[in-house]
C-alpha cells in the first residue's frame, strides 16, 4: 500500500468552507491506511486541539498547520491593498507550535483587513520550528507562474522570474523546510503551471509535495459542499452568477488515488511522508495550572502582611499568606451577624477549607475572583449572591464572593472542591447585565490585554437551522421551510436522523414536496458543521503570561484590538493550561439595585439584606398567592400554579421549589410527592433515623445532590470527598463502577451497624433519585434572589414595579404585562412629567395612592444627552412654566424633535397647555429656546443677570385651547412611549369586554399544539396580498388590552376586514376574533382568522366551537365524570374554581354532589357550568347535571 499524508486539508473549522467533520475524517483516513494527516484551515487554528485529540484517538499522527494569508507590505496593519497570498505552515515541534500560535494571533490582532494576514517580516522572525509549502494557485509562487490568468496579470503577476525570486526568499527563510505544492484536480490553470513548478524544483533544489485541496470527506458530498458555499455567500443554488467549482475533486482521496495521479513524479508522494516524519509535535494537554494573583504584594502592603517571598511577582506561598489573612478577616465581619454559640463551628470549617484550597494551589484563583467582585461592588455594580457549587464554600462567603451562609442550609464545600478528586474550581459570577462589561474591562486593565481574553464559541448548523439554511439555498418557500423545520421535535441536540425516526410527518413532507428529499439530504450532509465564530456570553480566561503561548487569539471586530478572544473553545481551555471564569449578566440584579435606590430616595431607608429575616411570613404570603410576576425564577404561569399548590412557608421551601420545577422531578412524581408530604397527605418517612436531619428540610424526599452525598457519608461511611466521587459516578451511570460502589456502600453500612439488606434498598433509591438531584448550592443562592425580589414586591411594590419597568423599557410587550399587574396592585402609571420624572421609571404618591411615573429615558427620540441636560437644568428646582423650561435647557441637546416627543408623551401637561396647543406652536417653542440660549451665552458680558435677560424672551403663543381627538392623542402616546398611558382605545368597551371570557395576548405563551381561541380587540392594520394561486389573503394586526399581534386572513374574510378598515368608526370598534392557532414543538403560536364577531353576539363569553386552552387531564374522561367541553344553549349556574386547588378527589366529590342533586324535571333548576381559572386564563366546562341554586351555593361555599 502506498504511503501518503494529506497536507492540504480544511476541516469544519474553515468556517462555511471546510466540510470535513473531524470524527468522520479520522475514521475515513484510518480505513484508507493513512498514518498521519495535517490540518490547514484558512487563517485560523480554531480546531487545532480538537483535531489533535480526534486524530490521536484513531492512532493517526496529527500535524497542526494553517493556510495563512500573507501580504508583502512592510507594516503588518497596512491597508493600502487587499492583495494577499496563501501559504501553508506546519508545526514541527513545540517551538513551531508556539510560533504558529503567535503568527495566527498577530494576523487577527494587527493584520486583520478583510482576512487575518501576516507579512514576510513577521513570518521570518517567527519561522523557527515551522515547515512551509507554496499552497494552491493563490500561493505567491504559483500566482506569479499563472500568467494564463488575465486577472493575475492585471494585478501584477510577472511570470517565472518573479516566481523564482519569491521561492528563493522562502528557501532562504525555511531552507530545506520549504516545499512546492502540486495539485491535480483537473483545473486548467493548475495543469498549465505544473511544468514550471517542476522546472523551478530542479533549478532551485526545492522538493515537491503532492497535495489535494481537501474540503469534504466523500466524493458524493461535492453537491452538498456547493450548497455549503451558497449558505456562506447568501446565494441560491440556481443563481448563475454565484461562485462555483469547475471540478468536484476536493475530497479525501486514498493513497492509491494520489499515487496514480502523481505516477510521473512519485517523489511528490514520498515527500509528504518526509514532512510527516519531520513533524513530531507532542502536546502536554490536560494539566491546567491555576493563575497566581498578580497583585498579592499590593494586597499584603494594604493589610500589613509580611510575605514569605516578597520579591516575587508570582508566588503560591505569597498567595496563600494573603488568602488566609483575608479569609479570617472576612469571617470576623460575617460573625457579627451570627449567634456567638456557633462561632467555633465556623472557625473550624474555615480552617479546613483554607487548608484544602492551599494544598490544591487555588489560593490565587480565589483572590482573583475576590478582587474583581470587590471592585465591582465598590463601583456600585450589582453582583449576585452566588451561583453554582461555589455557594457551598464558607471561604467564598468570607471573601464575599458569595452572600449566602452555607452552614444553615447544609451546603457542602466538597461539592465545590473535592480533595479526593482534583478538578479545577469553577466560580460563575452574576453581574448587572448593563455593567458586566465594566468588570471585564477592569480585569483587562489590571492584568494586561495580552493576558485576558474572552472565549470563542461556534454557531453550528443544527437540525432546525440547517433545514432553513439549505431550504433558502434550494429556493424552497419560507412557509414550506418553516413547516419542515417545525416538524423537528423540540429536543436539545436532536439530530435529523433521530427526528426522522420520531416524527412520521417528516417522511410525509419529504414524499409530497418536490424539493423535500433534496433539502433533507443536503441538510443531513451539512448538519453539525460550524457556521460562524462568536464570543461566549460569559467566559473569560486570565493568564500569568501572554495568552498566545497557550492559545492563539482572534478578535471579532476589526476596530477592537482590546477585547481579544481565544481561538480554542471552552471545551479545550483546561487542555491548554487555562481556567475559565464566567462573568454572567443577570437583569434581576439591576432591578433589585434600582428598586433599592428608589426606596432610599423616597423613604431615606437602606436595605441591608443581612438584617432581614429570610423566613418573613408576609413575603411567603405573596409567594403563596401566586401573584409572583416579576419575582425571580417563579413568575411563569407554571411556577405561579406550583406556589399556590405548595404554599412555601420558609426559605428551605423556595430552595426546593427551584430544584423541583424541572421536567425530571415533575414527570417522575417527585414534585407531587413533595407537596403531599408537606401538606400531610402522605406520611414523612426516613430510611434510617440517622437521616432525619438530612431529609427533614425536604419532607423525606431526596431532592439535592448534597443529600445524596450526605446519605453516602452517614450510612456508607464514605468521606464527603468520596461521597462526591459516588455522586459523579451515579451521574455517568457506569455499570461496573456502580456495582463496586454499591458493594462498598453496603459493606460500610454493615460495618457501622446498619442492616445490609436495608442499606442495599436505600442504594437503589439513591440511584433512582440521583438522576433528578439538583445542586442545592446553586438552588439556594438563586433562592436568595427569589426571596429578595419577593420581599421588595411585598414591602415596596411601587419601587419594585418601577424598577421592573425600567429593566424592560425597550420591550413593549413586557411593559404591557407589568402594567396589567400594576392595575391588580392598584398602582397607577402616570405619563412622564417634565418636573417629576427622572431617567428611570420612579415611584411617588398621588392623591394618597401609589403611582409610577414614566421614565424620561424610555421616551422615543429623547435620548440620554437630552435627559441629562433636562435633569441638570432642573437641579435648582422645578420649572415654573414653559418659558422657564426653555430658558434653562440647551437647544442643541433638547432640539425640536425632542420637544415634539415630550409633548406627544404628555410631559408638559402640568404647565396648563393642551398637547395640541403646544404641538401647533412647535416653531415658536424652538425659536424661543434658541433665542434664550443666545441670551445666556451673552449674559457673562452683560450688566444684567442671566434670569433677568431671559425673562425678556417669551414664547409667542398662538392661542388655542382645543385638544387632540382621543384616538389621535392615544396614537401619539403609543408612537412615542410604545404603550397607551392616559387611556386605551378599548376603554369605551371595557364593561362589555370585562364580561366576556377570552384569551389575553399575555397568555399566548401558554398555548400548546393546535386549537381555537377567542380574542377581543380592535383592528390596528391590515395588509392584503395575492397568493401564487391567485387567491387573496392578508395579515391583520389585532390590538387587545395588552399588546398587538398578527394573524393570517384567508380569502373568505378579506372583504369583511377591508370594509371595516375603510370606515373609521367601524375600525375603532372592538370585535371578537375567533382564531385558529398552531403552537407545535414549543414554537411561538401562529394565528389565522376564522371569524369576526360583534361584541353583542358574544353571550357570556361563549361561541360555539371555540375551545379554550390548557384543559386539565382530570376533565378528559366524559364517561367517568359527566363533564364535557361542548357548549350548548341553556340557562346556567356558573361556579368558579381555582385549577391549582383541584385534584382527582375534589373533582369526584363535586361530581357526586351534582349527580345526587341532578333533577331535570324541576322547573327552576339550571345546568351546572364549571368556570376553571388558571394563571390568567379561563376554561368553561359544561356538565350534564341540572341542579338547583341551593346546591350550587353548597358547592361554591365548599370548593370555589
From Swiss-Prot:
<comment type="subunit">
    <text>DNA polymerase III contains a core (composed of alpha, epsilon and theta chains) that associates with a tau subunit. This core dimerizes to form the PolIII' complex. PolIII' associates with the gamma complex (composed of gamma, delta, delta', psi and chi chains) and with the beta chain to form the complete DNA polymerase III complex.</text>
</comment>
<dbReference type="GO" id="GO:0005737">
    <property type="term" value="C:cytoplasm"/>
</dbReference>
<keyword id="KW-0235">DNA replication</keyword>
<protein>
    <recommendedName>
        <fullName>DNA polymerase III subunit alpha</fullName>
        <ecNumber>2.7.7.7</ecNumber>
    </recommendedName>
</protein>
<dbReference type="GO" id="GO:0003887">
    <property type="term" value="F:DNA-directed DNA polymerase activity"/>
</dbReference>
<comment type="function">
    <text>DNA polymerase III is a complex, multichain enzyme responsible for most of the replicative synthesis in bacteria. This DNA polymerase also exhibits 3' to 5' exonuclease activity. The alpha chain is the DNA polymerase.</text>
</comment>
<dbReference type="InterPro" id="IPR003141">
    <property type="entry name" value="Pol/His_phosphatase_N"/>
</dbReference>
<dbReference type="InterPro" id="IPR016195">
    <property type="entry name" value="Pol/histidinol_Pase-like"/>
</dbReference>
<dbReference type="InterPro" id="IPR011708">
    <property type="entry name" value="DNA_pol3_alpha_NTPase_dom"/>
</dbReference>
<keyword id="KW-0963">Cytoplasm</keyword>
<dbReference type="InterPro" id="IPR040982">
    <property type="entry name" value="DNA_pol3_finger"/>
</dbReference>
<dbReference type="InterPro" id="IPR004805">
    <property type="entry name" value="DnaE2/DnaE/PolC"/>
</dbReference>
<keyword id="KW-0548">Nucleotidyltransferase</keyword>
<dbReference type="InterPro" id="IPR004013">
    <property type="entry name" value="PHP_dom"/>
</dbReference>
<dbReference type="InterPro" id="IPR029460">
    <property type="entry name" value="DNAPol_HHH"/>
</dbReference>
<dbReference type="GO" id="GO:0008408">
    <property type="term" value="F:3'-5' exonuclease activity"/>
</dbReference>
<dbReference type="Pfam" id="PF02811">
    <property type="entry name" value="PHP"/>
</dbReference>
<keyword id="KW-0239">DNA-directed DNA polymerase</keyword>
<dbReference type="InterPro" id="IPR041931">
    <property type="entry name" value="DNA_pol3_alpha_thumb_dom"/>
</dbReference>
<dbReference type="Pfam" id="PF17657">
    <property type="entry name" value="DNA_pol3_finger"/>
</dbReference>
<keyword id="KW-0808">Transferase</keyword>
<dbReference type="Pfam" id="PF14579">
    <property type="entry name" value="HHH_6"/>
</dbReference>
<dbReference type="GO" id="GO:0006260">
    <property type="term" value="P:DNA replication"/>
</dbReference>
<comment type="similarity">
    <text>Belongs to the DNA polymerase type-C family. DnaE subfamily.</text>
</comment>
<dbReference type="Pfam" id="PF07733">
    <property type="entry name" value="DNA_pol3_alpha"/>
</dbReference>
Amino acid at each position: 500500500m502506498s504511503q501518503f499524508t494529506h497536507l492540504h486539508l480544511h476541516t469544519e473549522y474553515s468556517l462555511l468552507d471546510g466540510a470535513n467533520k473531524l470524527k468522520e475524517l479520522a475514521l475515513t483516513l484510518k480505513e484508507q491506511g493513512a498514518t498521519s494527516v495535517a490540518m490547514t484551515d484558512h487563517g485560523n487554528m480554531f480546531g487545532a486541539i480538537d483535531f489533535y485529540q480526534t486524530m490521536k484517538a484513531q492512532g493517526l499522527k496529527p500535524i497542526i498547520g494553517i493556510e495563512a494569508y500573507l501580504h508583502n507590505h512592510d507594516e503588518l496593519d497596512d491597508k493600502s491593498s487587499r492583495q494577499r497570498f496563501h501559504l501553508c505552515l506546519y508545526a514541527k515541534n513545540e517551538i513551531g507550535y508556539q510560533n504558529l500560535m503567535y503568527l495566527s494571533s498577530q494576523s487577527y490582532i494587527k493584520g486583520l483587513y478583510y482576512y487575518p494576514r501576516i507579512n514576510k517580516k513577521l513570518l521570518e522572525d517567527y519561522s523557527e520550528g515551522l515547515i512551509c509549502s507554496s499552497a494552491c494557485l493563490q500561493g505567491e509562487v504559483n500566482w506569479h507562474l499563472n500568467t494564463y490568468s488575465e486577472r493575475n496579470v492585471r494585478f501584477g503577476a510577472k511570470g517565472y522570474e518573479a516566481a523564482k525570486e519569491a521561492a528563493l526568499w522562502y528557501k532562504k527563510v525555511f531552507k530545506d523546510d520549504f516545499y512546492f505544492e502540486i495539485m491535480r484536480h483537473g483545473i486548467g490553470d493548475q495543469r498549465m503551471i505544473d511544468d514550471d513548478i517542476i522546472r523551478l524544483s530542479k533549478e532551485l533544489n526545492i522538493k515537491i509535495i503532492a497535495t489535494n485541496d481537501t474540503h469534504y470527506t466523500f466524493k458524493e458530498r461535492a453537491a452538498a459542499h456547493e450548497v455549503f458555499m451558497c449558505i456562506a455567500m447568501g446565494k441560491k443554488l440556481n443563481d448563475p452568477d454565484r461562485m462555483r467549482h469547475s471540478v468536484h475533486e476536493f475530497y479525501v482521496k486514498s493513497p492509491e488515488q494520489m499515487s496514480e495521479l502523481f505516477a510521473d513524479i512519485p517523489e511528490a508522494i514520498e515527500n509528504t511522508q518526509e514532512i510527516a516524519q519531520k513533524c513530531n509535535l507532542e502536546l502536554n494537554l490536560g494539566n491546567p495550572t491555576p493563575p497566581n494573583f498578580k497583585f498579592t504584594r499590593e494586597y499584603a502592603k494594604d493589610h500589613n502582611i509580611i510575605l514569605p517571598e516578597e520579591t516575587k511577582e508570582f508566588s503560591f506561598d505569597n498567595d496563600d499568606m494573603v488568602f488566609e489573612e483575608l479569609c479570617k478577616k472576612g469571617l470576623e465581619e460575617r460573625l457579627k451577624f451570627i449567634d456567638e454559640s456557633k462561632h467555633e463551628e465556623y472557625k473550624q470549617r474555615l480552617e479546613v477549607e483554607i487548608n484544602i484550597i492551599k494544598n490544591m494551589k487555588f489560593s490565587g484563583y480565589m483572590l482573583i475572583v475576590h478582587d474583581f467582585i470587590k471592585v465591582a461592588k465598590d463601583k456600585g455594580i450589582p453582583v449576585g449572591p452566588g451561583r453554582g457549587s461555589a455557594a457551598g464554600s464558607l471561604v467564598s462567603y468570607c471573601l464575599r464572593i458569595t452572600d449566602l451562609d452555607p452552614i444553615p442550609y447544609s451546603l457542602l464545600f466538597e461539592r465545590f472542591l473535592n480533595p479526593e478528586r482534583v478538578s479545577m474550581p469553577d466560580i460563575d459570577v452574576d453581574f448587572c447585565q448593563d455593567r458586566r462589561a465594566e468588570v471585564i474591562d477592569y480585569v483587562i486593565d489590571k492584568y494586561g490585554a495580552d493576558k485576558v481574553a474572552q472565549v470563542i464559541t461556534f454557531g453550528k448548523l443544527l437540525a432546525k437551522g440547517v433545514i432553513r439554511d439549505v431550504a433558502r439555498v434550494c429556493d424552497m418557500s419560507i412557509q414550506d421551510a418553516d413547516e419542515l423545520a417545525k416538524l423537528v421535535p423540540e429536543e436539545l441536540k436532536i439530530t435529523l436522523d433521530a427526528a426522522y425516526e420520531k416524527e412520521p410527518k417528516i417522511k410525509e413532507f419529504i414524499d409530497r414536496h418536490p424539493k423535500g428529499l433534496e433539502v433533507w439530504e443536503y441538510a443531513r450532509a451539512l448538519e453539525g458543521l460550524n457556521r460562524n465564530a462568536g464570543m461566549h456570553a460569559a467566559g473569560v480566561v486570565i493568564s500569568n503570561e501572554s495568552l498566545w503561548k497557550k492559545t492563539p487569539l482572534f478578535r471579532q471586530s476589526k476596530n477592537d484590538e482590546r477585547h481579544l478572544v481565544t481561538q480554542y473553545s471552552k471545551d479545550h481551555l483546561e487542555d491548554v493550561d487555562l481556567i475559565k471564569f464566567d462573568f454572567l449578566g443577570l437583569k434581576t440584579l439591576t432591578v433589585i439595585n434600582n428598586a433599592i435606590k428608589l426606596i432610599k430616595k423616597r423613604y431615606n431607608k437602606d436595605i441591608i439584606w443581612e438584617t432581614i429575616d429570610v423566613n418573613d411570613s408576609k413575603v411567603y404570603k405573596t409567594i403563596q398567592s401566586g401573584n409572583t410576576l416579576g419575582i425571580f425564577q417563579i413568575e411563569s404561569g407554571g411556577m405561579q400554579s406550583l406556589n399556590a399548590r405548595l404554599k412555601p412557608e420558609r426559605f428551605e421551601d423556595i430552595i426546593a421549589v427551584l430544584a423541583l420545577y424541572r421536567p425530571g422531578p415533575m414527570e417522575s412524581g417527585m414534585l407531587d410527592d413533595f407537596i403531599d408530604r408537606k401538606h400531610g397527605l402522605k406520611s414523612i418517612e426516613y430510611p434510617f433515623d440517622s437521616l432525619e436531619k438530612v431529609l427533614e428540610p425536604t419532607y423525606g424526599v431526596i431532592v439535592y445532590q448534597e443529600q445524596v452525598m450526605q446519605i453516602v457519608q452517614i450510612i456508607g461511611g464514605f468521606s464527603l470527598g468520596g461521597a462526591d466521587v459516588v455522586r459523579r459516578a451515579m451521574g455517568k451511570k457506569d455499570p461496573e463502577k456502580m456495582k463496586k460502589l454499591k458493594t462498598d456502600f453496603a459493606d460500610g453500612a454493615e460495618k457501622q451497624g446498619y442492616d445490609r439488606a436495608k442499606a442495599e434498598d436505600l442504594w437503589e433509591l439513591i440511584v433512582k433519585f440521583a438522576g433528578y438531584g439538583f445542586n442545592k448550592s446553586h438552588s439556594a443562592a438563586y433562592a436568595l434572589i427569589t426571596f429578595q425580589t419577593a420581599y421588595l414586591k411585598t414591602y415596596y411594590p411601587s419601587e419594585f414595579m418601577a424598577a421592573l419597568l425600567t429593566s424592560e423599557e425597550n420591550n413593549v410587550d413586557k411593559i404591557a404585562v407589568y402594567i396589567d399587574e400594576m392595575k391588580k396592585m392598584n398602582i397607577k402609571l402616570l405619563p412622564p412629567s417634565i418636573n417629576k420624572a427622572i431617567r428611570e421609571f420612579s415611584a411617588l404618591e398621588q392623591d394618597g395612592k401609589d403611582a409610577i411615573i414614566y421614565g424620561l429615558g424610555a421616551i422615543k427620540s429623547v435620548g440620554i444627552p437630552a435627559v441629562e441636560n433636562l435633569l441638570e437644568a432642573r437641579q435648582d428646582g422645578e420649572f415654573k412654566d414653559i418659558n422657564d423650561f426653555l430658558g434653562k435647557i440647551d437647544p442643541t441637546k433638547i432640539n425640536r424633535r425632542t420637544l415634539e416627543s415630550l409633548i406627544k408623551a404628555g410631559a408638559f401637561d402640568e404647565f396648563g397647555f393642551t398637547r395640541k396647543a403646544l404641538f401647533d406652536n412647535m416653531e415658536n417653542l424652538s425659536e424661543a429656546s434658541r433665542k434664550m440660549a443666545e441670551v445666556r451665552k451673552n449674559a457673562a458680558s452683560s450688566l444684567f443677570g442671566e434670569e433677568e435677560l431671559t425673562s425678556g424672551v417669551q414664547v409667542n403663543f398662538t392661542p388655542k385651547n382645543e385638544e387632540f381627538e382621543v384616538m389621535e392623542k392615544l396614537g401619539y402616546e403609543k408612537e412615542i412611549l410604545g404603550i397607551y398611558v392616559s387611556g386605551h382605545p378599548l376603554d369605551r368597551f371595557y364593561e362589555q369586554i370585562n364580561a366576556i371570557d377570552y384569551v389575553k395576548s399575555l397568555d399566548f405563551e401558554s398555548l400548546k399544539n393546535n386549537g381555537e381561541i377567542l380574542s377581543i380587540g380592535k383592528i390596528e392594520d391590515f395588509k392584503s396580498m395575492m397568493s401564487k394561486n391567485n387567491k387573496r389573503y392578508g395579515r391583520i394586526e389585532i390590538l387587545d388590552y395588552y399588546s398587538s399581534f398578527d394573524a393570517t386572513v384567508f380569502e373568505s374574510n378579506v372583504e369583511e376586514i377591508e370594509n371595516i378598515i375603510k370606515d373609521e368608526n367601524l375600525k375603532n370598534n372592538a370585535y371578537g376574533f375567533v382564531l385558529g392557532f398552531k403552537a407545535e414543538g414549543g414554537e411561538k403560536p401562529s394565528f389565522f382568522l376564522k371569524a369576526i364577531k360583534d361584541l353583542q353576539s358574544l353571550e357570556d363569553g361563549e361561541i360555539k366551537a371555540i375551545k379554550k386552552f390548557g384543559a386539565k387531564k382530570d376533565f378528559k374522561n366524559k364517561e367517568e365524570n359527566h363533564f364535557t367541553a361542548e357548549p350548548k344553549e341553556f340557562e346556567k349556574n356558573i361556579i368558579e374554581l381555582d385549577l391549582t386547588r383541584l385534584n382527582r378527589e375534589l373533582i369526584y366529590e363535586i361530581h357526586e354532589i351534582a349527580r345526587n342533586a341532578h333533577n331535570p324535571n324541576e322547573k327552576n333548576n339550571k345546568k351546572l357550568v364549571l368556570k376553571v381559572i388558571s394563571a390568567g386564563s379561563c376554561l368553561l366546562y359544561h356538565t350534564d347535571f341540572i341542579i338547583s341554586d341551593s346546591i350550587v351555593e353548597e358547592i361554591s361555599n365548599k370548593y370555589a
